From Swiss-Prot:
Cellular component GO terms, alphabetical: virion component
Start and end residues of each Adrift-type SAM-dependent 2'-O-MTase domain: 104-316
Swiss-Prot/TrEMBL keywords: Early protein, Methyltransferase, S-adenosyl-L-methionine, Transferase, Virion
Coarse class of the protein's main subcellular location: virion
A Pfam family: FtsJ
Species of the source: African swine fever virus (strain Badajoz 1971 Vero-adapted) (Ba71V)
Domain of life: Viruses
GO biological processes: 7-methylguanosine mRNA capping; methylation
Protein's name in the database: Probable methyltransferase EP424R
GO molecular function: mRNA (nucleoside-2'-O-)-methyltransferase activity
Binding site for S-adenosyl-L-methionine: 136, 229
Induction profile: Expressed in the early phase of the viral replicative cycle.
């Protein structure tokens, strides 16, 4: 944990001193050398294996539930989000990064990806496939890192996302990255539905996943880095966030495992890690990467459940049988485990340590802190911001130093053409 605390002298707000900003959390998982046996059909998992994960889910949801009544009224919901925004240590950092370092599309996703790249020490970032990618924060961060830190002469990329339309919750092309770089994108407009190989980027569809992986490898070989930042909007139902995203997260992972080259690295977004299917998916990953980690960047808000699974140095590709089984499971999806979890006791212990560290300790601590701030600063948000401003500056300056930011030369900037009415 960081040595930087909130200090505001004595008085009624001394309790603000008790919360400290987070450090990058990284929990290593053991490689599994034994053969991978994928389950063709559902089998019963002994309850004892999942018991503590279920308890962890209950404990976290009990804390989250304190906020549920506030979500029911527009006024209290607005105040809650204002408070949570005030305790976000990275609020305001995006503009500083954009203007100081000539960076592009500096979203929260940009900060997280840059931090992941800098902390995880990847050996190659020059050729990347970024999935579930719009509006483009990951690509922009990789581009910036590639040229300013890795000093490669080129950055080659392909990307995909659920095609933005009024009929879906897909993120839009706010910055014109898709509009100005159509040849880099793998998904297609609904206007092309008549095409035999039409693909709208929906990774919950097995045929799309297989097709996206094929397109990616045809356009870019080798693929050194695969990223996926998919997440379904669950409204206010955060207690079911992991469950509602199971199929999406399986699809984005499968796309990566079908396309990532040997020796490549992978970064996948997840939320809580308590569901038996999620645990089994991590078990599958452990057969393919020399190093596997569950991470929580400091720029990922500590009040949310977001995690990133990182695989380093892919050791082998799928066998035809493994590919067939996993694609069939996605096509006829059910959430039973992909493997026999009883064979992975040591790995599950490491995963639980990550759950305990990220969710049961850090997230619960910050959720409780957020609720306490809500009670004390409901009508004094300006005062809360004044209290936190000095330490935000210290922490943001520290983050910029730790993550070694440098100015991106103009010649290396991505081509953007933000459409009318965008947020660029």
């Amino acid at each position: 944990m960081s040595n930087y605390y909130y200090y505001y002298g004595g008085g009624r707000y001394d309790w603000l001193k008790t919360v400290e900003p987070t450090n990058f959390l990284k929990i290593g998982l053991p490689y599994q050398a034994h053969p991978l046996h994928l389950q063709h059909q559902a089998t019963t998992t002994p309850p004892s294996i999942l018991e503590k994960f279920k308890r962890a889910d209950i404990l976290l949801n009990e804390v989250k539930a304190e906020m549920d009544p506030l979500m029911l009224q527009p006024e209290t919901e607005k105040k809650l989000y204002q408070i949570l925004g005030s305790i976000d240590m990275f609020k305001g950092l995006r503009k500083k990064v954009e203007f100081t370092y000539n960076a592009q599309i500096v979203t929260n996703a940009w900060l997280k990806m840059y931090e992941l790249l800098n902390t995880m020490n990847f050996n190659n970032t020059s050729q990347a496939f970024c999935n579930c990618e719009l509006p483009g924060g990951f690509i922009s961060a990789i581009n910036h890192f590639n040229y300013t830190m890795m000093h490669y002469p080129t950055f080659n990329w392909v990307a995909s996302s659920l095609y933005p339309s009024s009929e879906t919750d897909a993120l839009e092309d706010h910055y014109g990255l898709y509009q100005c770089n159509p040849d880099n994108w793998l998904m297609q407009s609904p206007l092309l539905k008549k095409n035999v190989d039409y693909n709208d980027g929906d990774v919950t569809i097995a045929s799309n996943v297989k097709n996206l992986a094929l397109r990616a490898t045809q356009r870019l070989t080798p693929i050194h880095l695969y990223t996926a930042d998919g997440g379904i909007n669950v409204g206010h139902d955060y207690n079911k966030q992991e469950e509602l995203n199971l199929k999406l997260h399986f699809g984005q992972a499968l796309t990566g495992l079908l396309s990532l080259s040997k020796g490549g690295n992978m970064i996948l977004k997840h939320y809580t890690l308590n569901h038996a299917f999620t645990l089994s998916l991590i078990c599958v990953f452990s057969h393919f990467f020399e190093e596997l980690y569950i991470t929580k960047p400091t720029s990922s808000r500590p009040t949310n459940s977001e995690t990133y699974i990182v695989g380093k140095n892919r050791l082998r590709l799928f066998t035809p049988k493994e590919e067939q089984i996993l694609l069939k499971r996605l096509e006829f999806f059910n959430d039973t485990p992909l493997v026999d979890l009883s064979l992975y006791q040591n790995l599950l212990e490491s995963i639980y340590f990550a759950v305990e560290t990220i969710h049961l300790k850090q997230q619960i601590e910050f959720l409780n802190f957020g609720m306490k701030c809500y009670r004390h600063f409901y009508n004094k948000i300006k005062l809360l911001n004044e209290y936190l401003a000095p330490k935000k500056k210290i922490f943001q300056d520290r983050w910029r130093v730790l993550n070694k930011l440098y100015v991106l030369e103009k010649k290396h900037k991505l081509k953007l053409c933000a459409p009318q009415g965008s947020v660029a």
